[in-house]
Amino acid sequence: YYPLTAAQKMHHNWIMDYGTQQVSGVSVVASVQAELDFGLLKKCIQMETERSGCTRIRFTKPDKDGNVQQYLVKQDPRDIGFKDLSGMGSLAKADELMQQWAYETFDGDDIPMCEFTMLKLPEGYNGFFVHMDHRLIDSCGLVVMIGDLFQLYTYYKYGTAYPQELADFETVLKKDLAK
């Protein structure tokens, strides 16, 4: 178990101040206008949860002062959901729905704080939606994680170079806490 870093505390304080985890959600749609092998994409998302330790962080129940601890689970065996939004007529209509998903909260203790959903979108776009608690990752890290996931996909689909190993989350966390 580890305490929160300074950056995580900032987001946690917002959650406490506003009484909702909604103020600490971050969501991204990553899609391409091309056919995707959703079986392979699912495999790559599952691999990404192994490679990106932040996706496996859980938070304990708050203590009497509202503070939480964080810990890393070794595996996340959850299935990856799939939504076919291609019949919605336009990307704008699909975006409206996904904007609603972005406001959903992760309520509870010792629960996953990251969720991937594979998507079939209007106008021939396909990809995934990722929704996370911002205490797990910053915006730059989210871009790196999405890039890594697509590199895994292109490695298995097209034989491109295998992506470099990512920084180990627990090692980086310990360094941040030592500052």
Annotate each PLM feature.
Residues K74-F82:
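Short, charged/polar, Gly/Pro-enriched secondary-structure boundary elements
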